Amino acid sequence: YRNFPDSISKKIHSYRGNIIRKIESCNIICAQLRAKSIHLLLEYPEVKYICLDQYFFLCGMSIPTANKVRISHKLSLYGRGIGVGIIDSGVYPHRDLTYPFNRIITFVDLINELPYPYDDNGHGTCTCGIISGNGSSSNKIYTGVAPEVTIHCFKAFDKLGKGYVSDILFSLEELITMSDKYNI
């Protein structure tokens, strides 16, 4: 349907609903509505279905597991000029990610809406270190797979490691939008 998000957005507003975000590539609207409004929206042919937002959970990762990743840089493949999109619990500006230059280019906090990079869980920072840590804190003993890539992080998971599916889908859409500019 043409103008799907706009026509349904108007209906949601007329039912006194609150639109949280739109994911236009998938024709998804995330909104808070009363139960009666949900039943009314289901009557429109452009609404395929309505579901409750679900939580996803981060998978566990321990430091001993992460340290088992062995990297050989004999081929001189460091990831220079490549951007990596991360949807996780955030990223702490650790020395291995910021020295001698900061490789955390994008940080969007969908949980607390803070403007600076942080990680209140640790999973995201661990993931970023495995991917792009340069080993400056360990005299190059522990380096990531591609230590020169830039990081584009969306914090979609909270300190307990849970995040809404809608935030994850929104993050994916934003990273796809940014892909040409940052070579993600």
Task: Show where each model-derived region lies.
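A short glycine/threonine-centered beta-strand motif
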Residues: 1-3
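Autoinhibitory propeptides
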Residues: 6-73
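Sec/Tat-exported extracytoplasmic proteins
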Residues: 16, 42-45, 51, 114, ...
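Hydrophobic residues at beta-strand termini and immediately following loops
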Residues: 31, 50, 107-110, 154-156
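Short, acidic/turn-prone active-site loops that include or flank metal/cofactor-
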Residues: 54-56, 108-114
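Short acidic, Gly/Pro-enriched loop/turn segments at secondary-structure junctions
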Residues: 57-62, 159-169
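Subtilisin-like serine protease catalytic core
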Residues: 73-106, 114-166, 180-184
